[in-house]
């Protein structure tokens, strides 16, 4: 089951966000949170907040276990 979270109107360029997003694609949630917490890029806190939102959606709306979740697909668009 796919769980979705969307962030819009973020004050960082898509190119900079893409560098951070590429680090966590395919990772388990705990590993992705650790990577984002230790990352010094300006987009890391924004992506971490979005990741936590997606996890909260999965746990609260679909009763999924946080330990079983991973980042299957994450992407950045210019808009």
From Swiss-Prot:
One Gene Ontology term from the biological process aspect of the record: translation
Database matches in Pfam families: Ribosomal_L22
Matches recorded under InterPro entries: Ribosomal_uL22, Ribosomal_uL22_bac/org-type, Ribosomal_uL22_sf
Stored SUPFAM superfamilies: Ribosomal protein L22
Ribonucleoprotein among keywords: yes
Record-stated family: Belongs to the universal ribosomal protein uL22 family.
Protein name: Large ribosomal subunit protein uL22
Organism for this UniProt entry: Clover proliferation phytoplasma
Phylogenetic lineage: Bacteria, Bacillati, Mycoplasmatota, Mollicutes, Acholeplasmatales
């Amino acid at each position: 089951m796919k769980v979705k979270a969307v962030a819009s109107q973020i004050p960082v360029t898509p190119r900079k966000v893409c560098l951070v997003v590429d680090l966590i694609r395919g990772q388990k949630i705990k590993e992705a949170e650790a990577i984002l917490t230790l990352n010094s890029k300006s987009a890391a806190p924004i992506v971490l907040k979005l990741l936590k939102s997606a996890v909260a959606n999965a746990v609260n709306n679909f009763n999924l276990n946080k330990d079983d979740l991973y980042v299957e697909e994450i992407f950045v668009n210019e808009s």
